[in-house]
Structures are given as C-alpha cells and as structure tokens.
C-alpha cells in the first residue's frame, strides 16, 4: 500500500472512531429518518459524504481503492449500514442526476442529498414487473407541460420517510419494451400519491407500496428526456462500482467470527461449518475487490452479478447456520449478535435487486457467452 493510501486509511479510521454514533439506530419512522439525516449531515460537514462522487458536485472524488479503504474502515468501526435510507439518493438518484440531470436539477438536488437535507426512494418495481422493468405498467400521460401519473409501485424501501422518488413510468404506450420509459423526479408530497408500509415477519417495516392517482409532475422533473428512461437509469452504472458491498461483507464476516467464538469447542462439525463460511466470505470479499478494481476506468460489466449472487446467498447461509447453532435459543442469541433481523430478512436477499436466477442468467449469457435462454 502506498503512503497516500495508508494516510487515507488513518484519516478514515480516526474520523470514524470519533464520530460513529453509539448504540443501534432507530428501526423505523420519523426517528429513523432523523437519525439517517443527522449521520449524513455529520459526514458531509467533514467531507466524508459521497466518497465516489466527483469533487465538482460536492463529493470526495475518491479513487476505487480509496473507496474500498473507506468502506473497510466504515464496517470495522461499526458505523450505520450503508444500505440505510440514504442509499438510493447517494448511489442511484444522485449519480443519475450527475450523469443526465439538467444544471437546475443538479444545483437543487445534489447538495440536499449530500448534506442530509433530503432522502430518496426508488419507484421501479411493480406487482407484475420486478425483474423485468421493461414491462412496467405505471403510466405517465402528457398533458401540456405536465405528466399525469397513474399506477402502482411496490417494494420501495423507506418510501414512508423519503422526500423524493426516482420514478420510472411508461410514457409511450405504442413503443416496445424499454423505449417507452421515462425517469422522473417525483416529490413524495405530491397530491394523489399514497404510501403504504408493508409489514413483514422481519418486524420493522422497510418496504412500501405506492399508489399514484392522477399525480401531476412537471416536465421540468424529467431526467434524461422523454422516453429515454432506460438508458438514464442504466447511467448509474458509470459511477457504481459496488464498493459499498465491501462494508456489508466485512460486517457479515465479523458476525460469522462472533458465532465461531460462541460455538462450543466440542461441536467440531459446527465449528468446521462456520470456518467454511468464514473462508467463503473472504473469497466473496476478494471477488468484490477485484470487480471494483477492474472496472475502475470503465463502465462496470456483468461481473457485478458474481458478487451480488455470492453475497445474497452467503447472507442466507449465515442465517441458517446461526439457527442450527443455537437451536431453541436462537431468537434471543441472534438478537444479541445483531443477526435477528438479518435472519428474518435473509429470504428476500435472493429476490431483491434481481433474483438469483436472473443473476445466473446474466453470468451465463454476458460473461460465459452461453446461448440466451428462452424468454
């Protein structure tokens, strides 16, 4: 490691040691919103917000290696999950605006995302269109200088506490597939928009469904142009290297190590199973590093699906082993190790963000060059 990278690590470690909030964050509602915004503001005030964003837009402009170092130290310091309610704004909406937004859109929204003044959610998936976004039905009808939106979105994380939504709608019913979509900025307080939290067995609600009944959005909120929503949404890939997954992997590996330490010495088979998981986690982390570094100067390719598939299934395996280890005492012990929610939510990991089946198709077709399967 070079002196500059070592210095970056020491700076990150020192700042995190002095600033990471103590205790678990609130699980939902207004208290959760206030916590996320305050933590984001604290990072922004010290120049640690938006580490991957270009400096000209208020970010840190960190290299891929510097981003990896930041997220390594972030995880080791026990900082709040990078997948909290700030994730969509920092990793999806913000980068999309940087790539495709107008000067006015950038000037208004980017500082608010970075400085902890506004939260964003995503309005892509629908009850009949999750993995196949090109088939969405929510419609944006053009009326003068306004889009009138009617439809239904689902599985929108933190929509109940968000200020804005990156919304994908169908604006040309005659066009085929993705050529009919438009990416728009949707304020969550717009009349006609209703948010309903979805309760799951995991407890605190994270997911929501959203209903649109003649929601009127000005054309000035269109990003990337009418009927150009698909390439606009894909533009995020030019910034996203998956470096935030490093923090998630390190956090999960640490929990495996905690389970290993709690496993009695006479349970040799279970200890071997946990040791195998520890090695598996290390290999996925190494793969995440490699994918991030190889895409440093290019738009990331389908290699990210390797990391996504490995991580999502690793989460489920860790949760299953923890249950086997503690048996009837598992609910109480898992909570003490911070794994209670992870176990109950683990089943969604291989569905959200692209199912394992879709990730395997991407790997087969785009990386291995195998024939495309039937659709």
Where are these regions (language model features)?
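N-terminal glycine-rich flavin-associated loop
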Residues: 82-104, 130, 146
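A short, Trp-centered hydrophobic/proline-enriched beta-strand micro-motif
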Residues: 116-124, 168
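C-terminal helix-coil-helix/basic helical segment that borders enzyme active sites and/or dimer interfaces
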Residues: 24-30, 264, 268-271, 282-337
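Glycine-rich beta->alpha junctions and the first turn(s) of the following alpha-helix
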Residues: 3, 193-283, 349
């Amino acid at each position: 490691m070079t002196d500059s990278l070592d210095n970056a690590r020491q700076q990150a470690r020192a700042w995190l040691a002095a600033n990471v909030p103590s205790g678990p964050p609130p699980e939902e509602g207004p208290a959760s919103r206030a916590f996320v915004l305050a933590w984001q503001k604290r990072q922004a005030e010290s120049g640690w917000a938006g580490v991957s964003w270009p400096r000209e837009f208020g970010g840190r402009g960190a290299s891929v290696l510097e981003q990896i170092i930041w997220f390594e130290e972030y995880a080791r310091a026990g900082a709040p999950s990078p997948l909290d309610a700030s994730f969509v704004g920092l990793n999806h909406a913000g980068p999309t605006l940087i790539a495709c937004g107008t000067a006015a859109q950038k000037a208004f929204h980017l500082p608010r995302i970075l400085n902890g003044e506004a939260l964003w959610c995503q309005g892509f998936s629908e009850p009949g269109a999750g993995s196949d976004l090109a088939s969405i039905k929510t419609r944006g009808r053009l009326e003068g200088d306004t889009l009138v939106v009617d439809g239904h979105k689902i599985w929108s994380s933190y929509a109940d506490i968000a200020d804005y939504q990156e919304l994908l709608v169908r604006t040309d019913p005659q066009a085929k597939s993705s050529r009919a979509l438009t990416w728009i900025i949707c304020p969550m307080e717009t009349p006609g928009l209703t948010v309903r939290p979805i309760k799951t067995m995991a407890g605190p609600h994270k997911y929501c469904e959203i209903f649109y009944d003649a929601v009127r959005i000005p054309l000035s909120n269109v990003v990337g142009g009418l009927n150009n929503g698909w390439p606009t949404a894909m533009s995020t890939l030019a910034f996203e290297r998956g470096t935030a997954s490093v923090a998630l992997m390190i956090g999960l590996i640490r929990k495996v190590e905690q389970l290993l330490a709690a496993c009695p010495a006479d349970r040799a088979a279970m200890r071997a199973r946990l040791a195998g998981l520890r090695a598996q986690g290390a290999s996925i982390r190494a793969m995440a590093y490699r994918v991030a570094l190889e895409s440093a100067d290019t738009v990331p390719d389908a290699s990210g699906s390797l990391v996504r598939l490995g991580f999502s299934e690793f989460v489920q395996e860790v949760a299953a082993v923890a249950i086997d280890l503690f048996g009837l005492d598992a609910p109480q012990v898992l909570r003490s190790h911070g794994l209670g929610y992870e176990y109950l939510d683990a089943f969604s990991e291989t569905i959200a963000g692209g199912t394992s089946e879709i990730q395997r198709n991407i790997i087969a077709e785009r990386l291995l060059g195998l024939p495309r399967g039937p659709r």
